[in-house]
């Protein structure tokens, strides 16, 4: 997905704490496997990411705040060249889209916070290492991303990658914020191919698609190409539960799914891309 080169970016929309150091305890998960696997493992043990993070103290943070965004992310041209600037542009586009959706219902969008970090970060849900990958903390209503996850998406999960694949990940996490505002984030936690946890994640995929299908109308982006859509669908499939289980365990167990299969994730991303309203993403009452 290509940004209009002349569009203005607001780097202040994203908090950049890369280069800070987090001291003390908190969640420290090894392996650099990304939040999808972490969530799957936690759910298998009877909890979820919020339960684990929420039970840990927030760790103090030291060091200077990164200034790269302020200095170098000024326009859509920068977003087309730099990964962090692309994140800024994607968030601004998502803000416009979801503001309009809420306004159409007479509501005002409460925008999520967005923080870029490296190595570790302190949140209201506790502290986490970069191994957790992208995640949303409902307690501070903030999306946290270590940009290194996008490299993991290609090298560890086997995705093709690409700008729209990266923005799919960001818009999925933004979708969790929308679910939180609508009271849907905790609608279901049971695992399995048709369980509540899977339905929650598929809805976030669908919300990502709703934005993607209408993103050009936000004024930040050029129309999607077939290649860009294919990259996002490839990323969605790469992080399907069946693909991850096959890669990690050598076998597939649908009863343990928490995010949906490759096919399910692609299907609901497509439903969003081709849809026009929140009703098109009602995974809790649909045959998934």
Name these PLM-found stretches:
Residues 2-17, 194-223:
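Post-HExxH zinc-binding segment in Zn-dependent metallohydrolases
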Residues 53, 120-146:
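Catalytic zinc-binding patch centered on the HExxH motif and its immediate surroundings
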Residues 174-190, 210-217:
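Catalytic Zn2+-binding segment of zinc metalloproteases
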Residues 149-168, 192-198:
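Short pre-active-site segment immediately N-terminal to the catalytic Zn-binding motif
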Residues 5, 242-288:
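Pan-zinc metallopeptidase signature
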Residues 81, 85-97, 101-103, 107, ...:
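Short helix/loop segments within enzyme catalytic domains
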Residues 1-72:
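Long amphipathic alpha-helical segments used for membrane anchoring, targeting, substrate engagement
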